[in-house]
UniProtKB/Swiss-Prot annotation:
It is found in: Cell membrane. SUPFAM superfamilies: MFS general substrate transporter. Belongs to the major facilitator superfamily. CAR1 family. GO terms for biological process: amino acid export across plasma membrane; ascospore wall assembly; intracellular polyamine homeostasis; lipid homeostasis; membrane raft assembly; transmembrane transport. MFS antiporter that does not display functional linkage as drug transporter and performs functions that significantly affect biofilm development and virulence. No substrate for transport has been identified yet, but plays an important role in the growth in the host. PANTHER family: MAJOR FACILITATOR SUPERFAMILY, QUINIDINE RESISTANCE PROTEIN 3. Disulfide bonds: none annotated. The chain crosses the membrane at residues 142-162, 181-201, 216-236, 241-261, 269-289, 297-317, 486-506, 520-540, 566-586, 591-611, 627-647, 654-674. InterPro entries: MFS, MFS_dom, MFS_trans_sf. Glycans are attached at N175, N180, N516. This is MFS antiporter QDR3. The gene is QDR3.
């Protein structure tokens, strides 16, 4: 029996057969082979199973397709390209999952001298690598030391002037309240400017941002040391704080460039020694140099620290931002498939409107139109799964360590394995796919309509870049619409502001009768609370993780509220005790050691609370933890700046006893927020769609 003739060679070649599904584009494979890929955990493996099964379904169906007449002649070229690209992405996933979790699993490739990136890159003694994770461990930890030392400067500048406030008042012929403005405005700069430095580093690279910012830091420190009046001092302190804030934002990104997630914990701990040592050393060294050479010596000391950092960065810090990114290759594949989206929809419609009787299997039997739809539907499913692969790869590879840029880092336990986080992340992936498809479709139409108007395109590009660099970093404020975020940040900010009430009161009260301590001794008064900061950061971090793990063992999942337990109760009890001890003993001029008991207790309590709230914030914003921490830093630095502005007038007006009794009451009342979150956190997560806020970032 003779069979009906097949489609023309052109059409037959366009049909997706079994061989095509196993092939990937040569160029993509080469990119994958030269890129470093690391395992993404069990989520990625779950995602990998479905595309493979779908491929088999597609192959079985498409092997049967033959037709009797060329009445349906759709252009299947885009479908074939999409099939190849998706197969390439699946092959990439297999390599991703099969890699051993080490950051040196691929042979290193040094960048030629002339192709190095960043300012003055040719004079760096350490060569740039295609992928910074290929550096030997000795080089990696040298870079960690450099950025840790550089990160000391910003927090150091917040407290270095505190022992010398009276000297500044006398030298610049001003008053204590005005000098406190220079301290508060510096804090404000530390909170605001990191939003932009981080954006700049992604656009221009880490090295260039470090070099520009520390060049400015050196210059503004010299200017501050030479300030002729209080107005110049305040203006220069704003610029000084803003330039020093770069490493607070970019340092975490550098750690992420150098280490895969499995290796970042130890590096993160070493890196954070710098920001933590700053507030501890600043009052001691500041008091010593101001006692010997006056308050201007504190700014020369800052200049020396920043200049040393600049030298280390210039000669020993190569660009670490990755040059070849496998994830970007995968994104390009998905963008390519989206560009063909309208053509694929046309093919789908053509199949839907075709005469089903004209389509036969290999035995000449008609194939229902639903099977043709299944072919196209399977491709759509594979595309969706491939997008999920890209999402998980990007999250695992690019998400840097989450840190609190002023206070000690508390161990962060990723909650992607909890049922809640899986549900949240899946919703986020779906929303992002829908948004990306819409944006790409609009972009394609816009490009087609304006391809003859280059001037408009250039102007539009400039406006887009300016918006992304200047305005978009402020979008993180939108997260304050999410109740858990605004509640936890409000309490964290109040607790942080209270720290500066203590710090400013120490320098004010101990410099007066009957104590009359010198600048050197004033600096030593900050040791008790600094020591308890270290203690609480160690104890609180382990306590935090123990609470989380105990809840997970009992209930089978990780929830953010499990971090808010007896650690918070201890802090709530210590807060009013510390405030009352310090406030009333310093008011009645008790023996100088007694008020320091209050500062030590407060330091321990505040670190327990701040550590727990920061980790709760990160866990409540899966995939956006860094954005949440930056927002938290912004709000609390604003409140800390306000505290430095008003503390001295309040001490003179109502006295330390009444002031710190009020602070104790505010802390006690605001701590009810944490108890409320403990009870209602799950309700907020279930009834408020944080994904809508993510889409606006």
């Amino acid at each position: 029996m003779s069979h009906s003739p097949n489609l023309s060679p052109q059409i037959s070649n366009d049909i997706i057969d079994a061989d095509t599904t196993s092939l990937a584009s040569t160029e993509t494979q080469q990119n994958i082979q030269h890129s470093q890929i690391h395992p993404i955990g069990h989520h990625g493996r779950e995602q990998s199973e479905e595309p493979q099964n779908t491929t088999k379904t597609t192959t079985t169906t498409t092997n049967k397709i033959h037709t009797t007449t060329p009445s349906v002649d759709p252009d299947l070229g885009p479908l074939r390209e999409l099939e190849q690209d998706l197969s390439s992405l699946e092959s990439q996933q297999e390599q991703y999952l099969s890699q051993k979790p080490t950051s040196t699993s691929i042979k290193t490739n040094k960048v030629p001298l002339r192709e190095r990136r960043g300012l003055l890159a040719q004079i760096v003694l350490i060569p740039e690598y295609e992928d910074a994770r290929d550096y030997p461990n000795k080089i990696k930890y040298l870079i960690v030391f450099i950025i840790a030392f550089a990160s000391l400067a910003g927090p150091f500048g917040t407290s270095v002037m505190l022992p010398a406030i009276d000297d500044i008042v006398n030298d610049l012929n001003t008053n204590v309240s005005t000098v406190n403005v220079s301290v508060g405005i510096y804090l404000l700069s530390l909170g605001i400017f990191p939003l932009w430095w981080s954006s700049f580093s992604e656009r221009f690279g880490r090295r260039s941002v470090y070099m520009v910012s520390f060049t400015l830091f050196v210059a503004f420190s010299i200017g501050t040391a030479l300030s002729p009046n209080i107005a110049a001092l305040i203006v220069l302190r704003v610029l000084q704080g803003g330039s020093s804030a770069s490493v607070q934002a970019v340092g975490a990104g550098t750690i992420a460039d150098l280490f895969i997630p499995q290796e970042r914990g130890q590096a993160m701990g070493l890196y954070y020694l710098g920001p933590l040592a700053g507030p501890f050393l600043a009052p001691i060294l500041g008091g010593a140099v101001s006692q010997a050479w006056g308050w201007r010596a504190t700014q020369w000391l800052l200049m020396i620290i920043s200049a040393c950092s600049f030298v280390l960065i210039t000669f020993f810090l190569p660009e670490t931002l990755r040059r070849v990114d496998t994830i970007q290759v995968a994104k390009d594949l998905m963008k390519k498939s989206d560009n063909n989206g309208s053509q694929n929809e046309k093919i789908h419609d053509d199949f839907a409107g075709a005469d089903n009787s004209s389509v036969h299997d290999i035995d000449g039997n008609p194939i229902p139109g639903t099977e043709l739809h299944q072919v196209v539907s399977n491709l759509s499913r594979r595309s969706s799964n491939a997008r999920s692969i890209v999402t998980y790869m990007e999250e695992q590879e690019n998400e840097g360590p989450i840190i609190d840029p002023v206070m000690p880092s508390i161990s962060r336990l990723t909650t992607n394995r909890s049922a809640y986080s899986q549900r949240i992340h899946q919703n986020y992936v779906t929303d992002e796919l829908r948004k990306t498809t819409s944006n790409l479709t609009q972009s394609n139409h816009s490009q087609y309509n304006n391809n003859n108007n280059n001037d408009n395109d250039k102007w539009s590009s400039v406006k887009t870049n300016c918006y992304d660099l200047i305005i978009r970093p402020l979008h993180s404020i939108i997260l304050l619409k999410h109740p858990p975020v605004v509640l936890v940040i409000s309490f964290s900010a109040i607790s942080f502001a209270a720290i500066y009430f203590f710090n400013m009161a120490i320098s004010y009260e101990y410099a007066r009768s009957p104590y009359n301590f010198s600048s050197v001794i004033l600096g030593l008064m900050y040791i008790p609370n600094s020591v308890t900061y270290f203690m609480a950061s160690i104890i609180g971090g382990k306590w935090n993780d123990r609470l989380l793990n105990r809840y997970a063992q009992k209930h089978g999942e990780l929830v953010p509220e499990s971090r808010l337990s007896w650690n918070i109760v201890v802090a709530i009890i210590l807060y009013p005790m510390a405030c009352l001890i310090f406030g009333w003993t310093i008011k009645y001029r008790e023996f100088w050691v007694i008020p320091l008991i209050g500062t030590a207790l407060f330091g321990f309590a505040s670190m327990l609370v701040i550590g727990a709230t920061v980790t709760y914030l990160v866990d409540s914003l899966p995939g956006k933890g860094a954005t949440g921490v930056a927002l938290n830093n912004l709000i609390r630095q604003i409140l800390a700046a306000i505290a430095t502005f008003i503390v001295e007038p309040l001490l003179r007006a109502i006295g330390a006893g009444v002031l710190f009794s009020i602070i104790a009451g505010i802390l006690l009342v605001s701590s009810l927020v944490l108890l409320y979150l403990k009870k209602r956190g799950a309700f907020f997560r279930e009834h408020y769609d944080v994904m809508d806020l993510y889409a606006k970032l």
